[in-house]
From Swiss-Prot:
Chief place where the protein resides: mitochondrion
Protein's name in the database: Cytochrome c oxidase subunit 7A2, mitochondrial
InterPro entries: COX7a (IPR039297), Cyt_c_oxidase_su7a_sf (IPR036539), Cytc_oxidase_su7a_met (IPR003177)
Topological domain ranges for the Mitochondrial intermembrane compartment: 78-83
Pfam families from the UniProt entry: COX7a
Family: Belongs to the cytochrome c oxidase VIIa family.
C-alpha cells in the first residue's frame, strides 16, 4: 500500500514538474503607457468601461449603504412608545 502511494506521488510530481508552461504575452509595458498617459482622465477610470462601471457601482453601494445606516440609526434612536 505504501509503495503504491509513493509511486503515485512520484508520478504526480513528475507530471507537474515536466508539464509545459503556457506562454503569456507580457502586457505590462502597454498598460504602463496607458495609465501614465497625461490625458486628463482620472487613473481609476483609464481602464475603460469596466473600470467606469465598477467605480459607479462602488459609489452607488457606498452612498446607499451610508444612507441606510443613517436611517437605521435614526429609527433606533426613537424607540416606539409602549402603551
Amino acid at each position: 500500500m505504501l509503495r503504491n502511494l509513493l509511486a503515485l506521488r512520484q508520478i504526480a510530481k513528475r507530471t507537474i514538474s515536466t508539464s509545459s508552461r503556457r506562454q503569456f504575452e507580457n502586457k505590462v509595458p502597454e498598460k504602463q503607457k496607458l495609465f501614465q498617459e497625461d490625458n486628463g482622465i482620472p487613473v481609476h477610470l483609464k481602464g475603460g468601461i469596466a473600470d467606469a462601471l465598477l467605480y459607479r457601482a462602488t459609489l452607488i453601494l457606498t452612498v446607499g449603504g451610508t444612507a441606510y445606516a443613517m436611517y437605521e440609526l435614526a429609527v433606533a434612536s426613537f424607540p416606539k412608545k409602549q402603551d
